[in-house]
């Protein structure tokens, strides 16, 4: 039997994680459900991932036309609704982390699977933080609420590939205290 391939699912290339809320679900406000979330910063040079995301958004649009139409007489054009692929140079011009990159905000009410480069589960919370580099499996789907409609991005799983400089101006304790000079204080 052939394996079903979801055209609205993407496994990204290596990207940078920002606003990484992957261990504990957080609510945006008191009226919303707590969600796990991450902003995936994708270099514009990763054209393969960008094209896969655009194709998945198109697939989600085609699959979700009934939902997008709602009570209207017609389905809105894809260009007229909210889509999750955003240009960091345009939307975050003052944030160096988003320079020359696109970004996608992905979230889920269920916890994502979190693994390392060897696909082994990561249990130590300090291993995943805003600034780390990794890959993510994400799915795109149509939504239609009272206030807006469009295509959203669901978070499935993340894979840490390598460490990066923490975003947000906070260093990691492991980095602050890992100098050889400090290791000699017991001698």
Put a short name on every predicted segment.
Residues 1-103:
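OB-fold ssDNA-binding interfaces and closely related basic DNA-contact patches used
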Residues 1-6, 165-187:
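Acidic, gly/ser/pro-rich intrinsically disordered tails
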Residues 42-44, 140-142, 162:
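Beta-strand elements of well-folded, non-transmembrane domains
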Residues 54-59, 118-121, 169-180:
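Short intrinsically disordered coil segments
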Residues 103-117:
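Short, basic/aromatic beta-hairpin or loop at an interaction surface
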Residues 115-134, 141-151:
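Exposed beta-sheet edge/beta-hairpin loop segments within beta-rich domains
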Residues 145-165:
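OB-fold/S1-family single-stranded nucleic acid-binding modules
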